[in-house]
Amino acid sequence: MASYNRTRRIAEEIRKVVSTMLINGVKDPRITSMVSVTDVEVTNDLRYAYVYVSILGGDEESTLTGLKSAGGYIRREVGKNIKLRYIPEIVFKLDDSIEKGMYMDSLIKRVNEKNAQQNEDENYDE
């Protein structure tokens, strides 16, 4: 249990550092300001940190390529800010949960509109 709490705390610290780096420290033009870190998962051995990013607007593939090329720099900054024996290898992954959530929201709105229209039609027929 203590190991889980430690990895969770480390993941949260990595998320903070990477988020700050994306706002202030990375100068790659492929990385837009519309990139946000949604989650970080760290393996139990602390060798890998999977950083899930959400990219709103813009070219997702180009942005991911920019993030991967800046990975070494970001890893070095993580090492400066978090004191660990091993600095995890940063692996960026696209998190499309926001897009999926927006799609589900649009489906729910469409169903609600259909139900409202059917209720109006039924009330009109009476």
UniProtKB/Swiss-Prot annotation:
Statement: the UniProt record of this protein carries the keyword Cytoplasm: yes
GO cellular component annotations of the record: cytosol
Gene3D superfamilies cross-referenced by the UniProt entry: 3.30.300.20
Subcellular localization, as worded in the UniProt entry: Cytoplasm
Top-level lineage group: Bacteria
Primary location class: cytoplasm
SUPFAM superfamilies hit by this protein: Ribosome-binding factor A, RbfA
Span of the signal peptide: none
GO biological process entries: maturation of SSU-rRNA
InterPro entries documented for this protein: KH_dom-like_a/b, RbfA, RbfA_dom_sf, Ribosome-bd_factorA_CS
Subunit structure: Monomer. Binds 30S ribosomal subunits, but not 50S ribosomal subunits or 70S ribosomes.
Function field: One of several proteins that assist in the late maturation steps of the functional core of the 30S ribosomal subunit. Associates with free 30S ribosomal subunits (but not with 30S subunits that are part of 70S ribosomes or polysomes). Required for efficient processing of 16S rRNA. May interact with the 5'-terminal helix region of 16S rRNA.
Protein name: Ribosome-binding factor A
Species name: Clostridioides difficile (strain 630) (Peptoclostridium difficile)
